[in-house]
């Protein structure tokens, strides 16, 4: 990567840690991020068989709070936060423009009755924050905490024992798409039972001040369980194999949730939200293209369960060849 380009990119608080353990860094969404450590195939297979640790601190965290918080969230997303969320619950949802196009797909965490955290894609943070602020007619408080948050993921069959040895929380009791606040080696963390690999896994949020110490503890535990650090290359092959879409690549503002097999995350009956009228019209006319992402989708919260994830080996192998060619070039 040219030096002048590298200097213009954002870096996570774990940048120097990645350099120390030999990561190959690339530009992604305005960030300088690890694409691989050992090699993409090895990292991919290690997540499938054991456990991998990921730095996802380039993702965005936007907190909406106050008396008008829920009303604003309901207006912004297609899914039904009011009807489905309680404290500690997580909801997947598209966020659409008036034409029904997907501005972003995100996770909504209910931290309290009047406090929600939206986790958005890295390349969309600024645009999403401005969009949310522009539609804040309910005097909610909106805070972009992205630069002050470190997000580390553990994904794979051994992620439970990797995390449990360090946590004061019984992580086996955290159900899929739920979270709990706790301590990991005395560091305050949100422990979220979520992931983007199609495996058992957790995503861990903490203040950026504690990020390096949290990584060090989790990294040592991961290695002890036979795991590896994993870059964005294997993260992409893992999500492709699991059939999970990437905003900006598979879905964007030119595609609607109905076209993207995301109708399970659209609640037309909940009341008004941005894009609702366009989606109602599209549903009635059925005049739209369709992508086969989720052949077995059915859960009202998120359909990505271990029992129904398709194993897309052909996509995995094809992408690995492409990714390795690009990494070597």
Segments and roles (model prediction):
Residues 9-15, 26, 32, 136, ...:
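Glycine-rich, acidic
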Residues 46-57, 102-115, 142-145, 185-201:
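Residues forming anionic-ligand binding surfaces in small-molecule and nucleic-acid pockets
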Residues 1-93, 101-103, 233:
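Acidic, proline/glycine-enriched N-terminal capping motif
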Residues 255, 260-329:
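Glycine-rich, small/acidic residue-mixed loop/short-helix segments
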Residues 68-73, 126-128, 160-163, 210-217, ...:
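Short, conserved charged micro-motifs
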Residues 85-91, 125, 172-180, 303-305:
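Glycine-centered loop/turn motifs
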Residues 83-135:
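Well-ordered mid-protein domain cores that form the structural environment of catalytic cofactors
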């Amino acid at each position: 990567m040219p030096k002048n380009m590298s200097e213009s990119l954002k870096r996570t608080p774990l940048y120097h840690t990645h350099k120390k353990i030999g990561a190959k860094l690339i530009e992604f969404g305005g960030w300088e991020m690890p694409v691989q450590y050992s090699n993409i195939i090895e990292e991919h297979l290690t997540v499938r068989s054991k456990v991998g640790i990921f730095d996802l601190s380039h993702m965005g965290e936007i907190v909406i709070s106050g008396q008008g918080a829920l009303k604003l969230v309901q207006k912004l997303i297609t899914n039904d936060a009011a009807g489905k969320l309680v404290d500690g619950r997580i909801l997947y949802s598209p966020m659409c423009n008036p034409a029904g196009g997907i501005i972003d797909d995100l996770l909504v965490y209910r931290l309290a009755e009047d406090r929600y955290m939206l986790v958005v894609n890295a390349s969309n943070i600024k645009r999403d924050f401005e969009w949310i602020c522009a539609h804040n007619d309910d005097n909610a408080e909106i805070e972009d905490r992205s630069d002050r948050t470190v997000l580390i993921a553990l994904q794979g069959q051994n992620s439970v024992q990797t995390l449990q040895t360090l946590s004061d929380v019984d992580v086996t009791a955290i159900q899929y798409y739920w979270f709990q606040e706790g301590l990991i080696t005395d560091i305050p963390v949100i422990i979220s039972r979520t992931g983007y690999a199609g495996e058992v896994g957790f995503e861990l949020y903490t203040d950026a001040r504690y990020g390096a110490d949290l990584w060090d503890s989790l990294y040592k535990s991961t290695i002890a369980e036979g795991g590896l650090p994993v870059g964005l290359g294997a993260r992409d092959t893992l999500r492709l194999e699991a059939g999970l879409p990437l905003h900006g690549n598979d879905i964007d503002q030119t595609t609607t949730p109905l076209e993207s097999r995301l109708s399970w995350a659209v609640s037309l009956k909940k009341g008004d939200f941005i894009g609702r009228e366009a989606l109602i019209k599209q549903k009635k006319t059925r005049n739209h293209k369709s992508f086969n992402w989720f052949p077995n989708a059915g859960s009202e919260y998120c359909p990505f369960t271990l029992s129904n994830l398709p194993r897309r080996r052909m996509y995995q192998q094809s992408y690995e060849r492409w990714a390795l060619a690009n990494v070597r070039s």
